[in-house]
Amino acid sequence: MTEKLLHFIRTKSGSMHWWLQRFLAILLAPIILYLLFDVAIYIGQQSDPTVMMFLNRIFNHNSIFIFITSVILIWHVRGGMEVIIEDYVHGEKTRIVSIFLIRVIAIEIMEYLYKCSIIF
């Protein structure tokens, strides 16, 4: 069993990337549903809900949870965008530059989220 797993990880095919995308999607589904239900229940309990109350509930009540969800979501989007570029961009230089830029943008967004999480 361990040998099969190690062989699966070491292969240079796209199967590991495919499995990571599916895992992140499955991981994101219940997290986002939880956040939506949590906010819906909270707003339903308020007599006069406002946007600030909504944002306060999301970012102050679940700040670590939001940070982790954002990182997972950004990683999932980055992987999906790379697959789209690999499949539909035909110029080699354009493909390499596009993938590089997507990775840089994803890292910058995660750095920004980290800095924001320290502030809050």
Curated annotation (Swiss-Prot):
Could you tell me what the cofactor note in this record states?
Answer: The heme is bound between the two transmembrane subunits.
Instruction: Choose one Gene Ontology CC annotation of this protein and give it.
Output: mitochondrial inner membrane
Stored InterPro entries: SQR/QFR_C/D, Succ_DH_anchor, SuccDH_FuR_B_TM-su
Q: Topologically, how does it sit relative to the membrane?
A: Multi-pass membrane protein
List the stretches on the Mitochondrial matrix face of the membrane: 1-17, 86-95
Q: CDD domains annotated for this entry?
A: SQR_TypeC_SdhD_like (cd03495)
Pfam families in alphabetical order:
Sdh_cyt
**Residues given in the record as a ubiquinone binding sites:** 88
Task of the protein: Membrane-anchoring subunit of succinate dehydrogenase (SDH).
Name under which the protein is recorded: Succinate dehydrogenase membrane anchor subunit
Q: Which gene encodes it?
A: SDH4
